[in-house]
Amino acid sequence: MPPLHKQLTIVVGIIELDNRFLILRRVDEVPLWHHKWELPGGKIEAGEIPADALRREVFEETGLQIGEPQLLGIHTHHWNLPELTQQTFLIAYKASAKSDGVTLCPEENDAFQWVTLDEFLSISDHLEANKDMIAALYAPLQKA
């Protein structure tokens, strides 16, 4: 594993509607992440509260308004990139979408789906960090 050179904290949201949640297909110059399915979310800006960052990121990426985000927890993932290892902290929330009218930001994503938990877990081309986080923090809630 290359040495740890970068640490990043992001918010991600499991945005629910009608017993499904929203996933987006990423457009990225990094091949490891390009055309991988992911949850809406992104970087927290300076001075921003994580729940507000989630609202902003979801709106920027999808045009959706969401209800009050509920904190699921924090998950850590290490990305082994060719030149470094990036440690990413994912602050995970779930929230309800106020509508299903998704308008994608084409610079960030080129497709979306509303999926069940089982459908998401069966997708092979997803961001590993999202799948690990969902398995750790969200899936146990669905089985309770």
How would you describe each model-predicted region?
Residues 1-22, 43, 90, 94:
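Conserved N-terminal beta-strand and adjoining loop/helix that marks the start
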Residues 3-7, 33-36, 83-89, 106:
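A generic structural micro-feature
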Residues 36, 43, 81, 134-136:
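A generic membrane alpha-helix/interface feature
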Residues 14, 37, 113:
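Residues that recognize and position ribonucleotide moieties
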Residues 72-73:
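Local beta-strand/beta-hairpin segments that build beta-sheet-rich folds
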